[in-house]
Structure formats: structure tokens, C-alpha cells
Swiss-Prot record:
Keyword annotations from UniProtKB, A to Z: DNA-binding
Record organism: Rickettsia rickettsii
Name of the protein: Histone-like DNA-binding protein
GO CC list: cytosol
Superkingdom in the source lineage: Bacteria
UniProt keyword ATP-binding, yes or no: no
Family: Belongs to the bacterial histone-like protein family.
Pfam families tied to this protein: Bac_DNA_binding
GO MF annotation list: DNA binding; structural constituent of chromatin
Amino acid sequence: MTITKAKIAAMLSSKLGFSNHLCEEIVHTVFSNILEIAKAQKLTLKNFGSFEVKQKNPRPGINFHTKALVIIESKKHLRFVPSSKLKALINESTR
């Protein structure tokens, strides 16, 4: 299921009774702050999970067309580790 920030804002608006515009600003601000924190360090959302930017080291690879050995450059990737409570919730809902 894909959910947009606008949909989250609409859900907040209907649940809390605030204007849709205010809820959109709140959601945008929250996500912007989460992104800024996640870029700099590990971000843990209690009872949800942890986001961390990890660095992959350069490694050898093979070009499948030419069979030549190439070096794959280092790059950053995002790692998410769900909390034990989130895992338990997911496992309960599948039973």
C-alpha cells in the first residue's frame, strides 16, 4: 500500500479537526525534519524502527557484456531495521 503525505494530512485533518492546509504543513515539516536527521545520523522512531545511512565499500564486479572486471564505486544506502514491537504487530496481523 502506498500512502502520500497529502493522504496522511487528510487523515490527520479528519481525525483532529484541523484544517487540511495546516495538517499538510505539519506533515511536510515532520518529514523534512526526519530526513535532515536521517542524513546526519541514525534515526530511531520508538516502536517503529531505525533508519541509518550506511556506506558500501568499493568492490569488484563483472561487466556481463564484455566479461571485463570493473570496480563498483562506493555509495551510500539506507538501512531500515524494524523494532521488535513492529515485528510482533505484523506477525500478529498475519495469523
